[in-house]
Amino acid sequence: MLPGDVLLVSSVISYLGCFTKSYRVELMDNFWIPYMIKLPDKIPNTLTKEGANVLSLLTDDVIIAGWNNEGLPSDSMSTENATILTNSLKWPMMIDPQLQGVKWIKNKYNKTITTIRLGQDGYLDLIEKCVSEGRVLLIENMPEDVEPVLDPLLGRQLIKKGKAIKLGDKEVEYNPEFKLFLHCKEGFIYNHLNLIPMQL
């Protein structure tokens, strides 16, 4: 990847997830790409050419077909969302009233996923187990107000040189294979997360 490609791809992953398709296109076509073209010292890239697809650098037809087989809808917005979701360093929050993204995530990780809702019996123990064993955790129907005990997890605030995380009064061993997916049906925003609107 050329430096300009890295700049555009990282911008898409970091900032576009929470926007609608039309606003994503507007930002790319009317702001970001024209800005890159007008720079006096051009940054080498392949993405300012007509018809270039930023996310094609992160995925291909085989990966997309796999996602579709796992239940992801085949429209371009869902493909963009999945690409952003799978490449983000922040935990993704899926705004998903129709449960399209939830269905896909459950199918994609069907053998290793644990699904919980905050407040259910023993949910903190399940979170600790997933974190320490490197499992995939899906928290469904996230409330607008999240318990402060989860802040270190949402913000990936690792301690002991990245080997542990504090959950409440416990230090839990952090397995780097751990993955967290969050789901809500409403569009409230968390600063620690990468929002992915999965509605059609």
Feature-to-residue mapping (PLM):
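Conformational switch/transducer regions in large eukaryotic molecular machines and scaffolds
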Residues: 1-200
